[in-house]
């Protein structure tokens, strides 16, 4: 059984005395004796086994005379201390008696008496009285006898000794006071339930005893106040040890889950709403909004984690329910491996293309050698020469063929023709059916015939014939069809494309494009269609049978840069690239528009972004030449020969995915201020070799390269930058024309 403590509130015992003393002294005249009221004795009832406070008796009042306090200063405090000791002894005995009895309920009764002319005061009102005033005792008054109280206390001890320690009966202790007056009274009863557990005999549980003064009622008579009874309720409280409550263990998240959900300042989880919502600084570190706001206001204008400078305006609230870092290391590793594989694949494709080109050249040489061998055998059979003569002639023939195949021929200067004294020549084109070379130029007589036109040159005698006016502004493109009617397609900055007949030197058809035209070309598969490349990147498709508007517009997929070149790739029975369509070159890249059943499907070619100035096509071998101006990665003009390829989509026989890859690179000077046009064509030797010719502004020349090994074969000098290059066949002779702003130079292959 838990031990119980008993506490005696001495101050509450003395408060009623102070209160009565104050009441009495306030009504007596000056110089009279002081009256001291002592608490009534505690009595025990044998019938009800309750404790009662004894009635107020006359001997409990001690009158203190201030006049005689000098002679009795020694004896008076002694009597008062004896009375106080007697009262405390009674309380101790009552507590010992009640320790053997296990009360379960204590009834407290507070009685209020209403007397005529009286006033009610609580015990707390006189607690401020000095303790020294209590011990002013008058020697004339005797001490109240205590014989009756001692007898009652002895009876209480005898009764408590008869009570068994193991008795489990419940007892009720009632503390009451008797009423002396005849006035009405009201009684309030408060019941307090006390649970008492059985205690072992060896360890009795002490009880805590508190004596509180409930009420003091005083009646003030005319001469001397007569105090009412002082009620001292006895409250017995039992203290039991409360069992320790088992707290639920705190759940801790694993470090990998906890670290991503807590604020780095307060180490509390952030929320998706409220003041502690998820926020971030400009450096990217995450905190609770209130924490980082207080951190920055406190003078530390830096990130708590990386110490970068920060301010309150840098706080960004993130709207996220959960925040988890996605592990992309495997994805990045796969990307790097994919890029490595793609680079190796491009390198392998480049080597494969070079090998195929070399195989083609060697195959052609082998065919020629076999043909020569057959001719030699026929000659030997006809003339019947000896074996030695056959061997010597065979060796001489083979050595001659090898010397010719090694490229001993070259272009030699033939003639220079002045086109315009004022310059501004831009492009040229050759009509093979009429052996006519046309060059764009401004009008030689601007006052009579303003605008721009073309000058016709005869390739047979290399003489200029006449000027034909066509456009009102500068001409940017010229193209002939594969028909023999001599129709010239021209594009100019006056928002028109025109068809001009070289037979009559007149314009036969005009189409208004609405925007400046930078390039044009014919459709090789169907000569009724022509294409016009505009300044906004679009390509307009015109049908010569429809003289009003365009039949279709090819809108660019990417940027709207001007179309600097247009070339048509005809269909061919080739496994490498059987598709036909128009190749569109802009300042940002290239796109191949595949034509099938009068419908066009775009294929973006993988070229280097930016810096593209021209794209030319060699339709027989499906190669194209892309010219790049100097940039950040390269400080010189580059010409890259690309091979067009196609792959079937989803095992379909009609759908292809078109692309290209580089085969050879040619480097020129470090200056490129003009949009020049270059040329890629087959060698005049007819051995399958491809030659590349491009202008070099730094040296004012045209450079000729061998595409197989990338070697520079020849450098054709000019007095100005070369703007356009045109190879042509005249009377079974191969010739090359280079155009500057004022003149044309003709070179012949010898």
From Swiss-Prot:
EC numbers: 2.3.2.27
Alphabetized GO MF terms: ubiquitin protein ligase activity; zinc ion binding
Keywords: Cytoplasm, DNA damage, DNA repair, Metal-binding, Nucleus, Repeat, Transferase, Ubl conjugation pathway, WD repeat, Zinc, Zinc-finger
Enzymatic class: transferase
Xref: PROSITE patterns: ZF_RING_2
Function (record text): E3 ubiquitin-protein ligase required for the repair of DNA interstrand cross-links (ICL) in response to DNA damage. Plays a key role in RPA-mediated DNA damage signaling and repair. Required to translesion DNA synthesis across DNA-protein cross-link adducts by catalyzing ubiquitination of proteins on single-stranded DNA (ssDNA). Mediates ubiquitination of the hmces DNA-protein cross-link, possibly promoting its degradation.
Originating species: Xenopus laevis (African clawed frog)
Major localization listed first in the record, in broad terms: nucleus
Subcellular location(s) of the protein: Nucleus; Nucleus, PML body; Cytoplasm
Cofactor(s) essential for the protein: [4Fe-4S] cluster
Protein name: E3 ubiquitin-protein ligase rfwd3.S
Pathway(s) this gene product operates in, as recorded in its UniProt entry: Protein modification; protein ubiquitination
InterPro entries on file: RFWD3, WD40/YVTN_repeat-like_dom_sf, WD40_repeat_dom_sf, WD40_RFWD3, WD40_rpt, Znf_RING, Znf_RING/FYVE/PHD
Compositional bias annotation for Basic residues: 105-116
Cofactor binding, note field: Binds 1 [4Fe-4S] cluster.
Catalyzed reactions per annotation: S-ubiquitinyl-[E2 ubiquitin-conjugating enzyme]-L-cysteine + [acceptor protein]-L-lysine = [E2 ubiquitin-conjugating enzyme]-L-cysteine + N(6)-ubiquitinyl-[acceptor protein]-L-lysine
Bias (Polar residues): 122-144
GO BP annotation list: interstrand cross-link repair; protein ubiquitination
Residue ranges of the TM segments: none
CDD domains (UniProt xref): mRING-C3HGC3_RFWD3
Source species, domain of life: Eukaryota
Compositional bias annotation for Low complexity: 387-405
WD repeats: 470-510, 512-552, 558-603
GO cellular component: cytoplasm; PML body
């Amino acid at each position: 059984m838990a031990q119980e403590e008993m506490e005696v509130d001495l101050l509450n015992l003395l408060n009623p005395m102070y209160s009565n003393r104050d009441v009495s002294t306030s009504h007596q005249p000056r110089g009279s004796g002081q009256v001291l009221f002592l608490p009534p004795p505690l009595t025990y009832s044998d019938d009800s086994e309750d404790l009662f406070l004894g009635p107020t008796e006359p001997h409990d009042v001690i009158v203190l005379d201030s006049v005689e306090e000098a002679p009795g200063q020694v004896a008076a405090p002694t009597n008062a201390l004896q009375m106080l000791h007697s009262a405390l002894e009674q309380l101790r005995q009552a507590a010992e008696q009640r320790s053997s009895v296990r009360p379960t309920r204590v009834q407290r009764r507070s009685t209020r008496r209403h007397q005529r002319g009286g006033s009610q005061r609580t015990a707390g009102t006189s607690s401020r009285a000095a303790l020294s005033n209590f011990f002013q005792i008058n020697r004339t008054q005797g001490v109240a006898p205590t014989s009756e109280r001692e007898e009652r206390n002895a009876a209480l001890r005898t009764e408590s000794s008869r009570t068994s320690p193991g008795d489990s009966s419940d007892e009720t202790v009632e503390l009451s006071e008797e009423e002396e007056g005849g006035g009405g009274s009201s009684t309030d009863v408060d019941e307090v339930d006390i649970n008492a557990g059985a205690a072992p005999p060896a360890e009795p549980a002490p009880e805590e005893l508190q004596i509180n003064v409930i009420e003091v009622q005083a009646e003030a008579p005319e001469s001397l106040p007569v105090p009412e009874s002082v009620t001292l309720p006895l409250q017995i409280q039992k203290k039991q040890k409360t069992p320790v409550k088992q707290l639920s263990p705190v759940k801790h998240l694993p470090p990998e889950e906890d670290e991503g959900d807590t604020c780095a300042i307060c180490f509390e989880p952030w929320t998706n709403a409220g003041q502690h919502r998820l926020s971030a600084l400009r450096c990217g570190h995450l905190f609770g909004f209130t924490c980082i706001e207080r951190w920055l206001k406190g003078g530390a204008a830096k990130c708590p984690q990386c110490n970068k400078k920060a301010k309150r305006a840098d706080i960004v609230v993130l709207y996220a329910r959960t925040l988890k870092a996605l592990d992309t290391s495997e994805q990045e590793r796969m990307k790097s491996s994919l890029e490595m594989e793609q680079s190796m694949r491009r390198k392998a494709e480049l080597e494969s293309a070079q090998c195929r080109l070399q195989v083609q050249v060697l195959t052609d040489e082998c065919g020629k050698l076999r043909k020569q061998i057959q001719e030699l055998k026929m000659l030997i059979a006809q003339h019947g020469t000896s074996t030695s003569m056959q061997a010597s002639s065979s060796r001489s023939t083979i050595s001659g063929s090898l010397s010719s195949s090694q490229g001993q021929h070259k272009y030699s200067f033939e003639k220079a023709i002045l086109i315009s004294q004022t310059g501004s020549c831009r492009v040229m084109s050759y009509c093979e059916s009429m052996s006519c070379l046309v060059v764009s130029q401004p009008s030689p007589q601007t006052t009579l015939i303003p605008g721009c036109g073309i000058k016709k040159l005869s390739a047979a005698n290399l003489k200029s014939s006449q000027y034909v006016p066509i456009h009102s502004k500068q001409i940017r493109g010229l193209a002939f069809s594969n028909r023999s009617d001599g129709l010239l397609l021209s594009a100019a900055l006056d928002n028109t494309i025109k068809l001009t007949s070289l037979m009559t030197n007149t314009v036969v058809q005009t189409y208004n494009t609405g925007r400046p035209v930078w390039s044009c070309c014919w459709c090789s598969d169907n000569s009724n269609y022509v294409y016009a490349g505009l300044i906004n990147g679009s390509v307009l498709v015109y049908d010569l049978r429809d003289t009003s508007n365009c039949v279709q517009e090819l809108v660019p997929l990417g940027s709207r840069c001007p179309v600097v070149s247009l070339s048509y790739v005809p269909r061919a029975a080739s496994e490498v690239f059987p598709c036909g369509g128009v190749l569109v070159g802009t300042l940002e890249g290239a796109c191949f528009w595949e034509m099938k059943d009068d419908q066009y499907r775009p294929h973006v070619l993988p070229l280097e972004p930016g810096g593209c100035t021209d794209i030319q096509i060699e339709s027989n071998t499906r190669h194209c030449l892309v010219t790049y101006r100097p940039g950040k990665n390269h400080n010189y003009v580059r010409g890259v020969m690309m091979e067009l390829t196609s792959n079937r989509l989803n095992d379909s026989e009609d759908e292809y995915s078109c692309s290209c890859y580089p085969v050879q690179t040619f480097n020129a000077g470090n200056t490129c201020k003009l949009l020049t046009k270059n040329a890629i064509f087959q060698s005049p030797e007819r051995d399958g070799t491809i030659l590349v010719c491009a202008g070099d502004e730094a040296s004012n020349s045209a450079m000729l390269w061998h595409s197989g090994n990338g070697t520079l074969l020849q450098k054709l000098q000019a007095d100005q930058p070369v703007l356009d290059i045109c190879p042509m066949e005249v009377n079974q002779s191969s010739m090359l024309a280079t155009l500057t702003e004022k003149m044309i130079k003709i070179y012949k292959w010898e």
